[in-house]
């Protein structure tokens, strides 16, 4: 059955095209520094926002009109698979991602839930045989059901911990079955509302035990996906333990998990943590922990996770700069963890949104590559820190000095002069590259 009859395959037509169902800047076969755009960007569709989201919010019912929503239960799950692979083919997108409950309804028992999963996974596997679209990552939803009201791996209830572990065990098996390149842990309920009734030490210790057991089981079944943690500071809990990349990295180091995990970084989560997207990417990169990206953007005037499709090309440029400096994302990719706005409720809007996001990152890729080729930012940074390449600065960096020697040096100094940071020049230069790359 076809769900998008009126829409053909999305093709690259160039910046002058007026066709809303065409890429203006994303040309998957265009070579950029020895790799195609498709290889650089590794785009993925988020199954939950694209095929299960009804666009409801706390103030109103869902508005989404989806041709597959005439079905229910397992029939709906199967219809979504059909729609998904038609969507993937028409968008020519290389990857997709899902939670367990996105693809199959939760049953009345764990056994029934697993049986539902087995049925849909078998169907997805058949579709993948004839599709170029692969599984970027999968995960399990350990946050929506009321059993997870107090957390999953960080729950105060050992039975919930066991149930969460059983779900992840099944998730790892599903990932192996479908050839997932990564496996994601997002701890939506792994945090607390108040310290007044929380044993933080026990919860953190248990969370680490959970991660170690997950990796042990992945090794047992020979599932070689990259494990990823997705930081978020809050929502739904008041304070989540994986607040941002820095706190997540400290957790991984403290529990000897830093060689097991990397980070799946979401732009909107960076905003909620009070960081720029590029800050989180940069911090992960310089610690060799940048694994994958949830490509979206938040609304700067709102304090919650709006999950908008990315359209800010200044941000996508700086993001792609960090990814290029990282020599790419390895097994990771750019998953559009984004949903159309509540007023964009037609099935056609799903295509428009993904086209906009893919074009925005294609622009970012080309501008970032030009910035790197011309060493625009590298030259700025090297010049700014040049005092550490000579004299006392070189001794500091090489560890050949101490406070005694530094005091002697300081006593010889007259007035210290500082050069201008010239931030306005740098920002204007980036604007120049943004405006001239496609001129």
From Swiss-Prot:
Q: GO cellular-component terms in the record?
A: cytoplasm
Record keyword Cell cycle present = no
Taxonomic lineage: Bacteria, Bacillati, Bacillota, Bacilli, Bacillales
What this protein is called in its record is Xylose isomerase
Give the EC number(s) listed in the UniProt record.
5.3.1.5
Q: What is its main location?
A: cytoplasm
Gene behind the chain: xylA
GO biological process annotation, one example: D-xylose metabolic process
What GO molecular-function term can you cite, just one? Answer: magnesium ion binding
| Reactions accelerated catalytically | alpha-D-xylose = alpha-D-xylulofuranose
> Which cofactors must be present for this protein to function?
Mg(2+)
Judged by the first EC level, this protein's enzyme class is isomerase
Catalytic residues identified in the record: 99, 102
